[in-house]
Amino acid sequence: MDRCLIFLVLILMGCNSSQNDQASTTVHETPEVTDTMRYQDEFHLKNVRMLTQGGDNAEAYWSFDSRMLVFQSTFEKWGTQCDQIFYFNPLEDDAIKHRPKMISTGLGRTTCAYFMPGDTTVVYASTHLGDEACPPRPERRDDGKYVWPIYADFDIFVTDLEGNILKQLTQEPGYDAEATVSPQGDKIVFTSMRSGDLELYTMNVDGSEVTQVTNELGYDGGAFFSPDGSQLIFRSSRPKSEDEIKVYRELLAEGLVMPTEMELYICNADGSDLRQLTELGKANWCPFFHPSGDKVIFASNHETERGFPFNLYLINTDGTGLEQVTHDDTFDAFPMFSPDGKYLVFGSNRYNGGTRDTNLFMTEWVD
């Protein structure tokens, strides 16, 4: 999944505005801001710390023991021309002064890395078997539509922390990526084109028992398990009208999707009891369950007219209690709580010196 939803993309998406019927309802007293990287009214954040400085860093996910982060980065200073996978210990390592350990091959493009049970291996997707070069980005379209590429060469692999690929989990033709692991350590959820559409699937951590979870037309992706492993939260852009369906299918035939409208959906891990969680309009994406399992944190630009900023929000799993968490004027996204519930990590454009750099930030979480 191409994740560079920043600045130009935000402007393009801002042309499609909608009304928000899920109003924020939570009220807090205003404390004095003492954290230098925390903005006013960010009540849930404490001791915000920048973990990287420079490049495009995102999708940082915690190890099971809440001590390590694995993430993807494009940063010329680190020798990467397109996303590669790195890991480090944010409690001890300084990723600003020293490049973290790269555990992908350095070939092709990678995405969506996640620790496996035991924290000695990582699952991620890569295009390197199809082509060792970085795959080309889509050219600007005559119709002006912003699109994401769905690279057919993406397959899912397991690597150790030295960068040795131990196993290839998917071998079907077409896109297989966006893998995340259940907190119970038994299942992986991922997005695949094997049915002819972008649907969610689960499999055992050894790649066996692949089971289709969703089956409605549209791009279902970015899925995560609930803390007890019983539910999935994901984002989807599901076309409704004949024209929307026609455009979706035409783009998909070109290996492209247009993520201008995305809402959050929740279901049981087997796909049952599927329901739409948000009806906010615009782009609502990268959801992750709160440690309680009763709320979801996600990124959204639904309150904007021009498509940005993106900020983080909380919502109850019954669709009530929408609350804004961050108050950035640019871009906050890719949130993940540590398994022990102490920390939140996210990607942001805050304090990037006016560049387009996206850096990782870590904060203590305050309920």
PLM regions and their residue ranges:
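Hydrophobic beta-strand positions that form the internal "hydrophobic ladder"
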Residues: L69-V70, V122, I188, L232, ...
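A flexible loop/linker signature enriched in serine peptidases of the S9 family
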Residues: Q53-D56, S73-I85, S104-T110, A125-D155, ...
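Bacterial signal peptide processing site
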Residues: N16-S18
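C-terminal motif of bacterial Sec signal peptides marking the signal peptidase cleavage site
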Residues: L12-G14
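Residue-level detector of Asp-centered blade-edge/turn motifs that repeat once per structural unit
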Residues: F64-D65, P117-G118, P183-Q184, P227-D228, ...
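Multi-bladed beta-propeller domains
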Residues: V33-D56, F88-R109, T159-Y175, N204-Y219, ...
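Beta-strand-rich domains and repeat architectures in extracellular enzymes and scaffolds
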Residues: D35-R38, N47-Q81
